[in-house]
Design a protein with these regions (language model features):
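Acidic-enriched, low-complexity/disordered segments with a strong bias for Aspartate over Glutamate
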Residues: 7-10, 19, 49, 55, ...
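Solvent-exposed edge beta-strands and adjacent loop segments
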Residues: 1-83, 131-152
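Extended aliphatic helical segments
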Residues: 2, 22, 36, 44, ...
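Structured, beta-strand-rich domain cores
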Residues: 63-139
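Mixed-charge, glycine-accented linear interaction segment located at domain edges/termini
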Residues: 138-221
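Generic serine detector
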Residues: 9, 47, 65-68, 104-106, ...
Length: 221
């Protein structure tokens, strides 16, 4: 038997940062189109909701506690956004450089990366975050005069999601988010997934559906 210890060297982990943002616009057929790099990404705040307790009482005692369905939301912040995000933000580009607002909002997928560090190595690994079935809400844009300490304007969007079924795995509930830890996942499988997400010389970047992600990462090495 081994006694518990705390804060061993190399195990004082933390997460920070966000990078490698990718937008995957949803096509009219319900699939995700070619991914585009999202430059200027400054923050992603995940905001899950639901899973609230609904207590049941019988025989003058607490009999059971039921949990409501959980939903996934987030806030994306960035200095800029790709042109492909315009339809997702309720815009229609009627000709080059001319955008009509207050249009239907397209769905999209999204991926980004956060860094894992520890006391021994600041860049020990990273987590990939995949988001499905997202729609963006209108957000405030504040344009201010340039003064002696100018700052770039930050755009912000609150997103809601519709979960997607995990094909071939009825034991799993539909999901809207997947997180992959590079320090634990097989490196070859992770590389194959990243080729899908970011593209390479043999294929365009695309967002694999949850069932495909499961198969890629769960399959025997």
């Amino acid at each position: 038997m081994v006694a518990l210890t705390w804060d061993d060297t190399g195990k004082r982990q933390y997460e920070m940062g966000t990078d490698h943002g990718v937008l995957y616009p949803m096509t009219t057929t319900g699939t995700y189109g070619t991914g585009v790099a999202w430059n200027g990404l400054t923050a992603v705040t995940e905001s899950p909701d639901g899973a609230e307790a609904n207590d049941m009482y019988a025989d003058n005692i607490k009999y059971a506690s039921l949990r409501s369905a959980e939903t996934f939301g987030a806030t994306i912040e960035a200095y800029t956004f790709p042109d492909e995000f315009i339809p997702c933000d309720g815009g229609a580009e009627v000709t080059d450089g001319v955008v009509f607002g207050q249009q239907s909002r397209s769905k999209f997928g999204f991926s980004y990366r956060t860094q894992i560090g520890n006391d021994a190595k600041q860049d020990a690994g990273y987590k990939l975050h995949l988001v499905y079935g997202a729609t963006a809400s209108p957000s405030e844009k504040s344009y201010e005069t340039i003064n002696d300490s100018p700052e770039g304007m930050t755009f912000s969007w609150e997103i809601d999601t519709d979960p997607v079924s995990v094909e071939g795995h009825p034991e799993l509930k539909p999901v809207a988010s997947i997180t992959i830890d590079s320090t634990k996942v097989d490196k070859k499988k992770l590389t194959a997934l990243e080729k899908k997400l970011y593209g390479d010389t043999t294929g365009e970047p695309t967002l694999p559906l949850p069932g495909e992600v499961y198969t890629m990462l769960k399959a025997a090495a």
